[in-house]
């Protein structure tokens, strides 16, 4: 099972769209695919047609993760997100045990798991990064985008160097690209200069 976090500390960059489209694309190739909505806003759940009645928070109440999974109309399974993830964020913050997500998924049989993370570096995001084999970073070509991506890459490197994860940065996905826009070209040029091996 390959666990992939879709993450960026900035909101509005296309994380949810990327996560949902990847889940749908992989499911369409007959790979057993799970999408985890780790954002309390629950947009990935809504986009997948999942009800926000059960989330990963329920695992802290003793429920097995397999009881919480729903099947979307797009052939992939969904572990929905909702406002109760705020309580999970607090629980993870106060729990010294890391990798709650990976432990919860251990007995499941999926080829790929995609995690749509919140647009901030909180305990939910950190646990997703620790639990994942790799991270895809959606990035909108706009001002200050390089600062945010550098911060996230540094965080992943710190977690890896401290032995908490083997997370590798799988790549940077440019989203909402408008080739007529000079700013898009400038940011793309900078990305190709600083992260040539990571760009999609």
Locate predicted features:
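P-loop NTP-binding core
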Residues: 1-200
């Amino acid at each position: 099972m390959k666990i992939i976090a879709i993450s960026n500390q900035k909101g509005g960059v296309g994380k949810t769209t990327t996560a949902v489209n990847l889940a749908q694309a992989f499911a369409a190739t007959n790979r057993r695919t799970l999408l985890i909505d780790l954002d309390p806003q629950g947009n990935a759940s809504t986009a997948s047609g999942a009800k926000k009645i059960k989330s990963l928070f329920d695992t802290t109440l003793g429920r097995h993760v397999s009881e919480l999974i729903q099947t979307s109309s797009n052939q992939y399974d969904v572990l929905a997100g909702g406002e109760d993830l705020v309580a999970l964020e607090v629980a993870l913050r106060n729990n010294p045990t890391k990798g709650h997500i990976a432990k919860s998924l251990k007995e499941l049989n999926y080829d790929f798991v995609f995690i749509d993370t919140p647009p901030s570096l909180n305990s939910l995001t950190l646990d997703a990064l620790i639990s994942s084999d790799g991270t895809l970073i959606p990035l909108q070509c706009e001002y200050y985008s390089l600062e945010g991506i550098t911060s996230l890459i540094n965080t992943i490197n710190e977690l890896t160097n401290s032995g908490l994860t083997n997370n590798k940065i799988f790549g940077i996905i440019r989203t909402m690209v408008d080739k007529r826009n000079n700013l898009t070209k400038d940011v793309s040029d900078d990305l190709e200069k600083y992260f040539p091996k990571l760009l999609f």
